[in-house]
């Protein structure tokens, strides 16, 4: 099954640009996870990855190997913006950026296509959840079927070749061990 790695903050986080607090877990549960699964992909967020040690190794591996990455930049989370940059350096396509409508994006992100949604802070209206979920399903299916360059790195450096996405042996062994425990 194809995989989608979700880049975003967790829990309730302050949006310092607007002074609001956004429940990012609600965005994940009601919009992103549902859309990814409806599009037929496995949805993975860093806080759901079983690992030993630091999250860095599986995070970098997922940024490289995921068939699709959805990055929610709503609260200008530095980690999410950094991970988006890493993804853009590693893969030329299949990266989707979303953000709450009041998101004040940094200048360097101004050229990206960012799918907006309206967040009310603690919640999201049902109609908005359904609208954004449908838009995200369409975006995911379109990118999986017809990948187009969405990375500024590969747009401006067209001769650049992405690294191999063959799974690392250590992580393959770890995944096999986890599968053995679950089975």
Model-predicted regions and their roles:
Residues 61-63, 95-109, 150-167:
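A short, terminal or domain-edge coil/loop segment
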Residues 1-51, 62-66:
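Conserved N-terminal substructure of TIR/SEFIR domains
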Residues 113-183:
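C-terminal interaction surface of TIR/SEFIR-family domains
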Residues 60, 73-142:
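Cross-kingdom TIR/SEFIR domain
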Residues 54-59:
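Short acidic active-site motifs
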């Amino acid at each position: 099954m194809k995989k989608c790695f979700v880049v975003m903050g967790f829990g309730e986080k302050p949006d310092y640009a607007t002074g609001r607090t956004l429940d990012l877990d609600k965005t994940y549960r009601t919009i992103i996870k549902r859309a990814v699964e409806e599009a037929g992909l496995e949805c993975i967020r860093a806080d759901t990855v079983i690992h030993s040690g630091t999250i860095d190794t599986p995070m970098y591996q997922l940024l490289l190997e995921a068939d699709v990455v959805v990055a929610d930049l709503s609260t200008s989370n530095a980690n999410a913006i950094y991970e988006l940059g890493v993804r853009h350096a590693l893969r030329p396509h299949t990266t989707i950026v979303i953000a709450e409508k009041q998101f004040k994006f940094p200048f360097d992100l101004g050229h990206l296509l960012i799918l907006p949604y309206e967040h009310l802070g603690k919640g999201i209206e049902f109609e908005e959840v359904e609208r954004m979920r449908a838009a995200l399903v369409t975006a995911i299916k379109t990118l999986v079927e017809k990948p187009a360059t969405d990375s500024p790195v590969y747009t401006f450096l067209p001769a650049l070749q992405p690294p191999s996405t063959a799974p690392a042996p250590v992580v393959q062994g770890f995944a096999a061990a986890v599968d053995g425990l679950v089975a």
